Amino acid sequence: MDMAQLGFNDEDMLAGLKPWVLCESPSYDPAAVNRMQDIAAHDLAVMGAPIERIPVHSSIGDCIRARFAHPQSDQPGLLIIGHMDTVHPLGTLKQLPFKREGNRCYGPGIC
């Protein structure tokens, strides 16, 4: 994948973001965190990354590793690390639903 050729379409980006926000994933609910992992793994696989699921401690859910091959293997790569939990308890979407107001979006896990 040539990252320089990726187009930026804010509507497409928001369409991809919304399922992530709508997937409630409290920190200590491993089933909920793993549902978020499933969404992320699917999206990364669609972009061409091989996915490795890494079981961690049973009280926090798994980790995933996605790798994108660098077109020039002798060049340094890029490491991106993130988390899939939102801290908020299940049911938070009822009080704090995903919404868009102009150029901003709101919901659990985003501003």
Predicted regions and their residues:
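Acidic/His- and Gly-rich active-site-bordering loop/insert found
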Residues: 2-111
